Amino acid sequence: MERGDQPKRTRNENIFNCLYKNPEATFKLICFPWMGGGSTHFAKWGQDTHDLLEVHSLRLPGRESRVEEPLENDISQLVDEVVCALQPVIQDKPFAFFGHSMGSYIAFRTALGLKENNQPEPLHLFLSSATPVHSKAWHRIPKDDELSEEQISHYLMEFGGTPKHFAEAKEFVKQCSPIIRADLNIVRSCTSNVPSKAVLSCDLTCFVGSEDIAKDMEAWKDVTSGNAKIYQLPGGHFYLLDPANEKLIKNYIIKCLEVSSISNF
């Protein structure tokens, strides 16, 4: 088939990237990217995860095949879109969420959005390297009009995983600035409606690097009445890019889903 003859993606396929479809999978894993990130890294997890798992990765507006769409700045509006697009993805099989850094906030709010719409929660919520917004360790994010070029560069390196020589290149920073600003607005908007009690009932696992900038991951236990565990792995904020850590996380996710499936039977 010629490239021009390829079928167009559906709206949902544009929002969720599934590189390796697995109709025989028992579970689906929905992944949420870090600040400035795309969908490809987590979508590739589907290549070497167990046959039990089909992986879908959120593709945010304003990047990749959605580059023509306006960037999203508000977590509530983003979650409304994600919850709607998720319906055909999760309707046939048990599912779990995995989010890293900014993706943890989107994953949590999406789980909450599903519950508020009388939809099932994920079997398990896996969060990585994100200081809970209700924690005293939470640091205020500057307003959009307060952000300097130097601060954008900082966020690119610390939360976007961008190598220093790129993050300090003015032209690169200028190019990335709209996306980073939008993503910072999303994270900043998460500070509204902070839970004062357990709002979910699913099990939760938090991963954090031993030298991570994320703090007080223990506070995520407050948001669910389900079982909650914290695991520290060697490395910094992007500890999960280490192949050994990535393999451990994938294996742990599969084990948790198998156990959850049995206990919920």
Swiss-Prot record:
Keyword Lipid metabolism: yes
Entry keywords, A to Z: Acetylation, Cytoplasm, Fatty acid biosynthesis, Fatty acid metabolism, Hydrolase, Lipid biosynthesis, Lipid metabolism
Signal sequence segment: none
Stored InterPro entries: AB_hydrolase_fold, TEII, Thioesterase
Gene Ontology cellular component list: cytosol
Biological process according to GO: lipid biosynthetic process; medium-chain fatty acid biosynthetic process
Top-level taxon in the UniProt lineage: Eukaryota
Root EC class: hydrolase
Gene Ontology molecular function: any one: fatty acyl-[ACP] hydrolase activity
Protein localization: Cytoplasm, Cytosol
Catalysed reaction equations from the record: (9Z)-octadecenoyl-[ACP] + H2O = (9Z)-octadecenoate + holo-[ACP] + H(+); decanoyl-CoA + H2O = decanoate + CoA + H(+); dodecanoyl-CoA + H2O = dodecanoate + CoA + H(+); tetradecanoyl-CoA + H2O = tetradecanoate + CoA + H(+)
Tissue: Detected both in lactating and non-lactating breast epithelium (at protein level). Isoform 2 is up-regulated in bone marrow-derived mononuclear cells of rheumatoid arthritis patients.
UniProt keyword annotation of Cytoplasm present: yes
EC code(s) of this entry: 3.1.2.14
Residues found modified as N-acetylmethionine: 1
Catalytic residues (UniProt): 101, 237
Family the entry assigns: Belongs to the thioesterase family.
Subunit text: Interacts (via C-terminus) with FASN.
Role of this protein: Contributes to the release of free fatty acids from fatty acid synthase (FASN). Has broad substrate specificity, giving rise to a range of free fatty acids with chain lengths between 10 and 16 carbon atoms (C10 - C16).
Protein name according to UniProt: S-acyl fatty acid synthase thioesterase, medium chain
Organism the protein comes from: Homo sapiens
Taxonomic lineage from the root: Eukaryota, Metazoa, Chordata, Craniata, Vertebrata
